[in-house]
Amino acid sequence: MPFPPAPQGGFPEDRVVWVFGHPRSGTTWLGHLLADGLNLKMWNEPYLGQVLGFANLLRDNEPARFQDPTFWMSEQQEAHWPASLNTFFMDVIARQGGAAKDHAGLAIKEPNGTVVAPLLLKALPQAKAIFVLRDPRDVIASLIDARKPGSWMGERVAEEFNRTRVVNQSIKRFQRIAAGLQELEQTAAGRLYEMVYERLRTDTFGEMRHLAHVLGIPCDEAVLRAAVDKNAYERIPAERKGPGKFVRTARVGGWQEELEPGEITAIHRQLGDFLRSRGYEIPGEAGGRP
């Protein structure tokens, strides 16, 4: 029996906005701002990007196999596979993304698919993307807190808590994301907005208004201001935020007090070039964002 056709009235490709960034970079907060302030329908972490993760694994671990033209996503087949993936992703969006009526667009929050963002944007040449960039040191400090026993994430993670493992895994992930971001800037030039978390914290309304302008999303400033106020960290009740909670501190630069000296050294040694290239200050060096 053939499958039923996808429903009509879904989101066209040019109204799809992917939200990428390392987990704990503020993508959830941004998602609320997009939904409440810019009227985008939010699709929270469908893990669509994860289906492409095997391509990166093959490229890293078996480069000869990755180059083999019999591999359907090899470079030799690049004239073909983006169209196939486009058909797949747009069908999934049509079937599961819901109706486009009454929404300015569909925001797909996919932090766990960030490492394959370039592949997604190659396959969806009309879609837009937001990349949330936050100081990796604050991100890693947040992940350590989240993984501790008794924390919101620690209760869901089976493996025993190990600070060193969390730091090392995060560094490796940031290295992959750094390479992916460079590729994404080329692949999605003109339809990519790099949202710096520290700027979003300083001027939330101004950054969101600028994002809407750059990506061509309609913006009612009164609605946006109300959304900014509604979703401000300061508005969250004290019992719902703090150490061990999903919403922690939203503090910029807290890593200096929260990370151990050896962890900071390891991060600077392995991610120093990325930090400098994105304007983040390394103590003892001149310039950059604090």
Language-model region placement:
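Walker A (P-loop) phosphate-binding motif
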Residues: F11-L34
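Short hydrophobic segments within beta-strands
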Residues: W18-F20, W43, V132
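PAPS-dependent sulfation machinery
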Residues: H32, D36-V116, A123, P149-F161, ...
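Short gly/pro/ser/thr-enriched loop/turn and capping motifs at secondary-structure boundaries
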Residues: G49-Q50, R137-I140, V228
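PAPS-dependent sulfotransferase catalytic domain
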Residues: L57, E62-P63, K101-V223, Y233-K245
